[in-house]
Amino acid sequence: MCGISACLNHTNNSAMTSVVNALTKLQNRGYDSAGICTTSNGKFNFVKSVSDDTNNAIHYIKNNPLANHHCSIAIGHTRWATHGEKTIENAHPHFDASGRFSLIHNGIIENYDQIKSMLVESQNYQFYGQTDTEVAVAYLSYLLSENKTWFDFNESLKGSWAIIALDKFNPEKLYFMRNGSPLIIGFNETNTKAMIVSELSGFDSDISQYCIVGDNDYGYITNNNDKYIIKSQQHYQMISMGKIVMDLTPSPYKHWTQREIYDQPNAIHSLITERIVDSQLFFPEFNTINFTLVEHIVLLGCGTSYHAAQIGRRYIREFRPNITVDVIDGADFEETDIPKSRNTLLILLSQSGETKDLYRALVIGKQHSLKTIGIINVENSLIAREVDTVLYLRAGRENAVASTKSFTNQVLMLFMLALKINLSLDNSQLDYYTMSLNNFPIEFKKIIDQSVNEIPKLLEFFDNQTSCFILGKFGLEWIAKEGSLKIKEISYVHSEGYSSAALKHGPFALLHQNIPVVLLANDDSYFSKIENANSEIRSRKAKVIFITNKLIDNHCTDYLIHINTKSPLFHLLCIVPLQLLAYHLALSKGINPDYPRNLAKVVTVE
């Protein structure tokens, strides 16, 4: 769950600049620590840094003189800690004892403990840190000293890896090796510049062609008559690079989280205008799927995507009731979850398209010949390339760890998918829903504007509070869980989301005087149940924040947010005040909401 970058550029010696810029764009993959390295005059020049409460590691790297060093070759790494604490010793790059190799790595070497024991016992090797990567570079050095090769190195590792290495004895070659973890090689138009990155967004704007390194491949990039070429075990056809426009700062907003919350109406508009054409739902991808044969759907997601999948389950069950639907956390999906005698469709939801647990589930599905659909935000990502059908979210890049606009577009995509395959709606009902969708960006913007004005009062309820509850019924239960996740993620306030009916079955014991409880309620047949919960909670002197589209007496609750809408997507509008509450709670505690502790946006380990 790390970001790696490397560059060869002999024309203007700006390799280090490219690497540092790439790391800035790859912070979504982790930011516990970071490091950069180059080689010259037979030695490595490097710097490492660790994130602290003041700044993240990339900030310290960018302010080090080495970040502006002129060189033709450089590598860089931003880390999410899996083996070993976030310390300078455990930060990448790592070096072997002889000082020959500098190596960076994304993934997990599963047999590193056995290799480490062998090196300690047979070579009396002294390790300075606790990472599997340090073991890998030590083992590489050992194998080559024993007249072994990179082939032997590749064959003897178990797990997943994307490795880049510098060799002091071959200072103009950039070595790479991949199995399971993503690795992409790109060139500029004249092949006078080469880059290796974890994802396409890490490339400089002048990279015009790329290839995705195949599993179990290894090799190097080298200079051949002033043009860089790939020498490896597999042959690659270069893919033309589309234009990637990526801002490096959240300007004019202070944080990416804030910008992405405010950008949701635009993201919604982009998705809806692609999927509703001439007032008709437009899914040409479904021409290859015969939904009349589909008997069962399994929706898979992790974290925020899991919450979106649960809401999508309700849509499909409502509009296509003859299809049964399960929602399973991608990390928990097993072969036994596939019905033996039913035609099953697998739908995978992932912002990044690289979620390791989901990719494992995809492999299982393909082994059982299931049809697969990916609902993905990042184009041409790992899962997007390997599913049978991909539906892109068109939410634009998310930089903040906490997902906002991708969640909104995931829910909308599932809503439109369910409408498209429906068996229960007539034309007038479909027209009503498509009209509601077309109006939704405007409604969403209104709720953002309204919620901003509510925030100062909401924050008062959280003064000196370390916990809160968010409750909803039916589809709003999963909005409650998503809002609760946002609060936990970026403000470090302990928050739990439940069905409003579940509170009295245990969690009620945690209520105490003044604890904030957010109630989400639609003006429907469940409203009276929410009113009962409101009374029960207030009788324990907890403070209730009521978010609803029904006009009620202000005296019935401690604080009322009335969302004036009859939209069938009211439940999705309820996420807005919760997202903004999480953001402003983080600010009130002096926390950078974009990069919460211990988290990474792209989860590429199991």
UniProtKB/Swiss-Prot annotation:
GO terms for molecular function: carbohydrate derivative binding; glutamine-fructose-6-phosphate transaminase (isomerizing) activity. It comes from the Viruses. Residues 282-427, 458-596 form the SIS domain. Pfam families: GATase_6, SIS. Keywords: Aminotransferase, Glutamine amidotransferase, Repeat, Transferase. InterPro entries: GATase_2_dom, GFAT, GlmS/AgaS_SIS, GlmS/FrlB_SIS, Ntn_hydrolases_N, SIS_dom, SIS_dom_sf. Its EC number is 2.6.1.16. Pathway: Nucleotide-sugar biosynthesis; UDP-N-acetyl-alpha-D-glucosamine biosynthesis; alpha-D-glucosamine 6-phosphate from D-fructose 6-phosphate: step 1/1. Residues 2-224 form the Glutamine amidotransferase type-2 domain. The active site is at 2 (for gatase activity). GO terms for biological process: fructose 6-phosphate metabolic process; protein N-linked glycosylation; UDP-N-acetylglucosamine biosynthetic process. The keyword rRNA-binding does not apply. It catalyses: D-fructose 6-phosphate + L-glutamine = D-glucosamine 6-phosphate + L-glutamate. Controls the flux of glucose into the hexosamine pathway. Most likely involved in regulating the availability of precursors for glycosylation of proteins (Potential). This is Probable glutamine--fructose-6-phosphate aminotransferase [isomerizing]. It comes from Acanthamoeba polyphaga mimivirus (APMV).
